[in-house]
Amino acid sequence: MGRLRRRQEIIDHEEEESNDDVSSRRGKLSLAETFRWLDSSEHRRIETDGHNDYKYIIHPKNRWYKAWEMFILVWAIYSSLFTPMEFGFFRGLPERLFVLDIVGQIAFLVDIVLQFFVAYRDTQTYRTVYKPTRIAFRYLKSHFLMDFIGCFPWDLIYKASGKHELVRYLLWIRLFRVRKVVEFFQRLEKDTRINYLFTRILKLLFVEVYCTHTAACIFYYLATTLPPENEGYTWIGSLKLGDYSYENFREIDLWKRYTTALYFAIVTMATVGYGDIHAVNLREMIFVMIYVSFDMVLGAYLIGNITALIVKGSNTERFRDKMNDLISFMNRKKLGRDLRSQITGHVRLQYDSHYTDTVMLQDIPASIRAKIAQLLYLPYIKKVPLFKGCSTEFINQIVIRLHEEYFLPGEVITEQGNVVDHLYFVCEGLLEALVTKTDGSEESVTLLGPHTSFGDISIICNISQPFTVRVCELCHLLRLDKQSFSNILEIYFHDGRTILNNIMEEKESNDRIKKLESDIVIHIGKQEAELALKVNSAAFQGDFYQLKSLIRSGADPNKTDYDGRSPLHLAACRGYEDITLFLIQEGVDVNLKDKFGHTPLFEAVKAGQEGVIGLLVKEGASFNLEDSGNFLCTTVAKGDSDFLKRLLSSGMNPNSEDYDHRTPLHVAASEGLFLMAKMLVEAGASVISKDRWGNSPLDEARLCGNKKLIKLLEDVKNAQSSIYPSSLRELQEERIERRKCTVFPFHPQEAKEERSRKHGVVVWIPSNLEKLIVTAAKELGLSDGASFVLLSEDQGRITDIDMISDGHKLYMISDTTDQT
């Protein structure tokens, strides 16, 4: 219970409400700040939660209630001292003391009533409780009974009972009010405005005086328990000091009797009595033995506390020292009331749990330390040119990891050629950047004033310090460790690119940065290469969120790796449809070739990613293989029918020729591969095309002797001859030269803006331009094909069908728009 009560007192301790004169390491500052718990906006929200629902509930920090507490404290001191005296010296109070006693009991009765309306702090949740039922129940089960019985008019009850002696013993219940005095001293010890040594000595003196005062009253009471005719058998009745005798001591002046009893109690407690006052009867001897035994414990308590004061080793002393340092710090930095309340409240809670640390602010939670750092350092960091355009999250991470440092004029902070471990920001003062020449002389490069930084280029570019920094005036700097800075850049890499851009922009007006331009450019190149690898890695792993974050942060999605592969190549081969679509919308070239001549479409077809193939074909992707005929012939020779089917369905020309002018159908016919030959002719392969030796696929089939294959090719030949009545050479050329193009429904100048919102269409190139326009308009959902014209990528108008090559990108616009 004692520990819980002490915890309650620590938490409920009133914040400093008067002017404090606090000594700091940098001089004396006058702390004229009022700490009121309810004046803090954050604590007001927490503390008054539910207060408006109970209008008659009193907050424990209410100033009128605090005044009432001091008023009751005075009565508690009076009652604590007068109760033993009333018990020992009075059998029936005189009229003037009786009236005073009644007034005191009325005051305590009023205090009992008030206790039912005073909110309290819950020791488990640390929230203020305003609910009347909980307040009443808490008081009823704790102090109510003793407080209420203590207010009984025991003097009247004693007289009404016929002066029954046992009734007088109930007076001691009023000593329960001593707890108010004890609680007052506990609060006083934690009040950093009052000298701790003075507070402790005052408390120890009060303990000693109160114990001896109570013992003196009991000593006198024991003497009065014997009738007057036997008073010679008491310590005071038999007492004779010099020529003065204490016979008939009841008639001696009250003050003299009390002084004599107090003298007896004090010399007995100190065990230095000379025997002039001593116990006479058995009851007095028993009490003296008990009292002396108690005095040994009391003496040990007093000596132990005095020793603790001398060595300054108590928890309270350490707590007070820490509070003084904190108040000095908060005063010097002019922290707001809300932040002050959080800091002091947390330190008081740590003291209650006996938690200590030698480093100031180390005990404070990270969230509160972050608030302090943002309040103190954020205005400086925001003005540093190095961080111009950086995100708020990045700057906040920088701010909460800063450390303050002060340097005197003439001090060298960092020297030229040294490895840099810290990044510095100038808050106040002036520094000079110096370069040491080969002959040992120093040349001033620039001056560093407030809101500048140094050590940044060395850390970012991983080079030695290019110049020496020396203090010219008293400087207040903020230091950031290299490792912390590097860790932050690992997470906020896009802000790292912004920092590099800021450095490059500054080189135009800063000669010292111009000299380091090559190092900066090399580092930028390395960073871009690393960023490209990160983008490709995210695409390969299917990390859509990371990929989007990288590209949104400025990474180029068209950057390739060491094999020339773009993120689209990797996403296509892995089958990530969402990433593929996102990269297409970001403008990645769908026909970009890697070092092996493969496009994203080829990678998707090779891996059998049907969904990705559809997306790429819709966007006009093609294979663009330099030796497509040889590749198709090899595929047929391997017998990979599934791969061949995907190639043909994705738009690869089935009439592509190898170096011997052989088509894939030639190979299939010569090997007797019926299924693959059927697949090729269904895709439009020509049966009448001839190789360098003049052989057609049908000739190869006849040499192979596969009757089923021969019949298939003869039927196809007859069908092709009936459909195309022109010469076989023209038919062969038409089949071999079959081409396709991609038509987009917007102007070439709008390509970048419209690409992510409008899609084109891939169509076969017909025999004339009019058919192409009509077909494209129909596929694009345009109304009248005759009212449109086709433009090339360089905005030139297409006037003839022969101007269009295979894979050409065209742009369809209105004829009226073209004329304007």
UniProtKB/Swiss-Prot annotation:
Q: Does the keyword Membrane apply?
A: yes
Which cell locations does it reside in? Membrane
- Domain KHA positions: 740-820
A molecular function GO annotation: monoatomic ion transmembrane transporter activity
TM regions (residue ranges): 70-90, 98-118, 142-162, 169-189, 204-224, 286-306
Q: Where are the ANK repeats?
A: 528-559, 563-592, 596-625, 627-656, 660-689, 693-722
Tissues expressed in:
Expressed in guard cell-containing tissues, in root epidermal cells and in root hairs. Detected in vascular cells of the root and shoot.
Membrane topology term reads: Multi-pass membrane protein
Annotated binding of a nucleoside 3',5'-cyclic phosphate, by residue? 386-508
SMART domains referenced in this protein's UniProt entry, alphabetically: ANK, cNMP
What do the Gene Ontology cellular component annotations say? monoatomic ion channel complex; nucleus
The record's principal subcellular location, in a coarse class, is membrane
Tagged with keyword Membrane: yes
Which key words tag this protein in UniProt?
Answer: ANK repeat, Ion channel, Ion transport, Membrane, Potassium, Potassium channel, Potassium transport, Repeat, Transmembrane, Transmembrane helix, Transport, Voltage-gated channel
Which residue spans belong to the Extracellular compartment? 91-97, 163-168, 225-259, 280-285
Which sequence ranges are listed under topological domain Cytoplasmic?
1-69, 119-141, 190-203, 307-820
- Gene3D superfamilies, per this entry? 1.10.287.70, Ankyrin repeat-containing domain (1.25.40.20), Helix hairpin bin (1.10.287.630), Jelly Rolls (2.60.120.10)
- GO annotation terms (biological process): monoatomic ion transport; response to abscisic acid; response to calcium ion; response to cold; response to jasmonic acid; response to water deprivation
Matching entries from InterPro entries are given as: Ankyrin_rpt, Ankyrin_rpt-contain_sf, cNMP-bd_dom, cNMP-bd_dom_sf, Ion_trans_dom, K_chnl_volt-dep_EAG/ELK/ERG, KAT/AKT, KHA_dom
Q: Which parts of this protein are intramembrane?
A: 260-279
Supply the induction statement.
Up-regulated under drought, salt stress and cold conditions. Induced by abscisic acid (ABA) treatment in roots and shoots but not in guard cells.
Q: Please quote what the entry notes about the protein's domains.
A: The segment S4 is probably the voltage-sensor and is characterized by a series of positively charged amino acids. The pore-forming region H5 is enclosed by the transmembrane segments S5 and S6 in the Shaker-type (1P/6TM) and contains the GYGD signature motif which seems to be involved in potassium selectivity.
Assembly and interactions? Answer: The potassium channel is probably composed of a homo- or heterotetrameric complex of pore-forming subunits.
Write out the similarity annotation. Belongs to the potassium channel family. Plant (TC 1.A.1.4) subfamily.
Task of the protein: Major selective outward-rectifying potassium channel of the guard cell membrane. Involved in regulation of stomatal movements according to the water status. Assuming opened or closed conformations in response to the voltage difference across the membrane, the channel is activated by depolarization. Conductance of the channel is modulated in a potassium-dependent fashion. May interact with the cytoskeleton or with regulatory proteins.
Q: Any idea what this protein is called?
A: Potassium channel GORK
Upper taxonomic classification of the species? Eukaryota, Viridiplantae, Streptophyta, Embryophyta, Tracheophyta
